């Protein structure tokens, strides 16, 4: 990977992060071109399509930039594609890596952030791997363990059988990142 990077004049020891942009329709090329229009002109950032619905941006992260700036960058992508391309998108990003060989890890983290975000944070358009919280832990649990837990807790009952107050409490629990203190506060009121 280092030899290939050298041939292509790509710095190997630069801070980078991977963004995944997922559209909810088959690409007509418009979304990819819009993102390339913003980031592709910079020789330090790379934009490519992975499949019909996913675009990847490997962005250089300057010294002093952190996750707040990356969240703003992701929001710019969402806003631009929502207004100009008139398509709803979700953007997820991994952690900042320091070497080119770690870019694949940032991609895997961004992919997991996208998957976990769809399950635990469906209303969010921007999902950061570093801010997944306990949703990431739950997502990584083995399926048999989850099924066993659900069977023990719900004892054969369907979530459709719960009253509205219980469902609201469960939703608030998830909205507060499964924070037990917030949950206790909700139950007190």
Task: Give short role names for the model-derived ranges.
Residues 1-187:
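Cytosolic nucleotide-utilizing catalytic cores of signal-transduction proteins
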């Amino acid at each position: 990977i280092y030899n290939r990077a050298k041939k292509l004049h790509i710095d190997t020891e630069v801070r980078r992060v991977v963004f995944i942009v997922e559209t909810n329709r088959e690409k007509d090329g418009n979304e990819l071109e819009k993102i390339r229009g913003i980031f592709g002109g910079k020789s330090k950032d790379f934009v490519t399509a992975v499949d019909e619905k996913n675009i990847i941006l490997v962005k250089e992260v300057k010294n002093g930039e952190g996750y707040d700036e990356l969240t703003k960058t992701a929001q710019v992508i969402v806003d631009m594609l929502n207004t100009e391309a008139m398509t709803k998108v979700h953007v997820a990003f991994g952690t900042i890596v320091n070497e080119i060989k770690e870019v694949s890890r940032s991609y895997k983290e961004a992919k997991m952030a996208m998957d976990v975000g769809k399950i635990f944070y469906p209303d969010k358009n921007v999902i950061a791997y570093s801010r997944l919280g306990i949703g990431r832990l739950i997502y990584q649990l083995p399926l048999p363990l989850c099924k066993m837990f659900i069977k023990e807790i719900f004892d054969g009952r369907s979530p459709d059988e719960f009253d509205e107050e219980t469902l609201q409490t469960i939703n608030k629990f998830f909205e507060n990142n499964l924070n037990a203190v917030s949950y206790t506060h909700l139950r007190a009121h």
